[in-house]
């Protein structure tokens, strides 16, 4: 299964509560935090919610 490298590139200050919750669920707490997650529909949904705050790359 593919994996996604998710990097937070913008601050969560001034965002809606559901966007802050999605960042926390992804494991991102501050700018330049990086997590690697499985490519699943649940993860894609959280990434879609905060796509303006993160950068996503596919890794092997």
Swiss-Prot record:
HAMAP family: Ribosomal_uL30_B. This is Large ribosomal subunit protein uL30. InterPro entries: Ribo_uL30_ferredoxin-like_sf (IPR036919), Ribosomal_uL30_bac-type (IPR005996), Ribosomal_uL30_ferredoxin-like (IPR016082). The keyword Phosphoprotein does not apply. CDD domains: Ribosomal_L30. The gene is rpmD. Coiled coil: none annotated. The keyword Ribosomal protein applies.
